[in-house]
Amino acid sequence: MVNTVTFRDFEERDIDFIYKCKNDEKLNSMVVGNFHPFTYEEAEKWVRGCMGEHETYKFWAVCTNDEERRIIGWVSLSNIDRINRCVCHHGIVIGDNDYRDGTAMFEAMIFTMEYAFNSLNLHRLYGSCLSGHKVSPHMLNALGFNLEGVQRDAVCRNEKYYDILNYAMLEEEYHSIVETGDLDIEKLIMRFVSSIKKSKVITNH
């Protein structure tokens, strides 16, 4: 299967897109952090802060896989700890509706997993998501992440409380998944759909 997206450093031309996404309350409704609308100046500062190499974090623009390489979202790693060899998967945002229901999020996760375990040679990759997110818990399950803990009723959205689900993967688990070919996109989608079906069965009971 041909990748639908590619990855690059942030550029000045991405500011308008970031400004739009950072002010889209619906897009940000199911992220762990609280919604904070951006001024255009804040969007400029944010993009420039994401550019280049940094000791403790790394951001990539998720782009169309063509000559234009137009930004459609972003993905990042934070809290890079080279002593304890661990890193936080800070999240994925796909702001372009045309790519939100495709494989872009899986491709972005595979890319950052490879970067964390192979390029940075780290031991542990961890992250979190809200229990009410329609995609993230099932995607992390499909990718082979382990649920390590639940912070109950930790975030309030529209007068409803959601748990924060904490996930992690170790380097030996990642390499085992790679060796068995379980990061194949088609296999991931099958496990993703299966996870959704199981959650619906549990909810209905």
Where do the protein language model's features map onto the residues?
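Acyl-donor (CoA/ACP) binding surface of acyl/acetyltransferases
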Residues: 1-15, 22-24, 63, 68-205
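Generic alpha-helical scaffold signal
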Residues: 12, 37-41, 56
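Generic solvent-exposed, charged/amphipathic alpha-helical segments
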Residues: 19, 44, 48, 113-114
